[in-house]
Design a protein with these regions (language model features):
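Residue-level detector of alpha-helix initiation sites
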Residues: 16-17, 40, 134, 232
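Glycine-rich active-site loop/strand segments that organize a redox cofactor
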Residues: 56-88
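Single conserved hydrophobic/aromatic residue that forms the stacking wall/gate
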Residues: 1-7, 12, 346, 353-355
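An anion/pyrophosphate-binding glycine-rich loop and adjacent beta-alpha core
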Residues: 219, 225-342
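Conserved redox-cofactor binding core of oxidoreductases
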Residues: 101-182, 187-190, 194, 239-242
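Flavin (primarily FAD) binding-site architecture
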Residues: 198-204
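Glycine-rich FAD pyrophosphate-binding loop
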Residues: 29-47
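N-terminal Rossmann-like FAD-binding beta1-loop-alpha1 element of flavoenzymes
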Residues: 13-34
């Protein structure tokens, strides 16, 4: 058994969007940092995020502001969101977008060069910046390139099995390389956990089958941390049902943001019963509950879903704004979404965590 000893001022687990963003921030402050991910850095789970990233840039609607973004967030959380956390996230969101732009991210833009933004659920204004419907992939590419420019060392495919703790102080981590079995003993002055959640306790989720298994939660608890609100998992309204080996594959919210329509098996546009003002652009929880209700009351499709229809949109819109949805449905079901609707159901998506 090979053992590799590694030392760093700070160790960050994982190498997805949040992990690499933290590593970049730390490195730019002159601190020695090591990022450790259990997948190849280009293939972190962030790359599966599709529809966009939210910030009150005001590029499309001048009346938007971080305060309005915060108000929308708190209201649609049923007042469960921590106001301090919401303030930090919404106030800092524009900086996050501008950093990505400065580092070379290829955002969709208007003809005059402004970053384009579209509506997502529960937004008062258009505030979702995007790159087609593969935004997460572009974010990950940008962050990997920036981290490599800063010469941040990244250990790929290393699974951290425990944090090292002495007298209630974390001083490193232990793990192994999943490809060749090499053991890693990492000494660090501080460890940041920036990994995924525990969605795989459900059968159908937007996560990969081998990810979001809750190991970051376990690492934290075994090191003496307390978990807060682990039950607050978001149910995303749209994931495909078939084939079974791909059940849960995400159909981006961008499909509804661009004008997609939800119908039950009777052909009824059912969101008019649940949120007649916002319709398909209601909050994810309301859309998911509406779809569940339609299915439970016998108005679902034969395979237990509802229909998402974008076939009324111009083909050019679909091919430029929803290319990943188009490609996914062609590959998995040989379904042309420019002419046919998609049958889907609600699924478990992700948690929002804050340190």
């Amino acid at each position: 058994i090979r053992l590799s000893l590694v030392g760093s001022e700070m160790c960050i687990r994982d190498s997805g969007g949040s992990g690499l963003r933290a590593a970049i921030e730390v490195a730019e402050h002159g601190i020695d940092v090591l990022a450790v991910g259990k997948r190849p850095r280009q293939d972190a789970h962030t790359s599966l995020a599709a529809g966009g990233i939210n910030a009150a840039l005001g590029t499309m609607d001048e009346g938007d502001s971080w305060q309005q973004h915060a108000a929308d967030t708190i209201k649609e959380s049923y007042l469960l969101a921590n106001p301090h956390t919401v303030e930090i996230v919404t106030q800092g969101a524009e900086r996050g977008i501008r950093d990505l732009e400065r580092w070379g991210m290829d955002f969709a833009r208007e003809d005059d060069g402004r970053i384009s933004q579209r509506f997502f659920g529960a937004h008062t204004f258009r505030r979702t910046a995007f790159a087609g419907d593969y935004t997460g992939l572009e974010i990950q590419r940008t962050l990997v390139a920036k981290a490599e420019q800063l010469e941040v060392p990244i250990l790929d495919q290393v699974y951290i099995t425990r944090l090292l703790v002495r007298d209630n102080v974390v001083f490193g981590a232990y793990g192994f390389d999943q490809s060749d079995g090499t053991r890693y003993l990492i000494h660090a002055d501080a460890v940041i956990l920036a990994a995924g959640g525990h969605n795989r306790i459900w059968r159908r989720t937007s996560s990969r089958r081998d990810e979001n298994t809750g190991d970051s939660f376990r690492l934290a608890v075994e090191a003496g941390a307390r978990l807060r609100d682990p039950e607050l998992v978001q149910f995303h309204p749209s994931g495909i049902i078939e084939p079974e080996n791909a059940a849960g594959t995400l159909i981006s919210e961008a499909a509804r943001g661009e004008g997609g329509i939800l119908r039950n098996a009777l052909g009824e546009r059912f969101m008019s019963k649940y949120d007649p003002e916002r319709m398909e652009l209601s909050t994810r929880d309301r859309v998911a509950l509406a779809a569940y209700t339609e299915i439970a009351e016998g108005r679902g499709t034969e395979n237990g879903g509802v229909w998402l229809d974008v076939s009324h949109l111009p083909r050019e819109t679909i091919m430029t704004r929803l290319p990943r949805v188009y490609q996914t449905m062609m590959e998995l079901q040989m379904l042309d979404i420019t002419t046919d609707p998609v049958s889907y159901t609600h699924l478990r998506a992700h948690e929002t965590k804050a340190n």
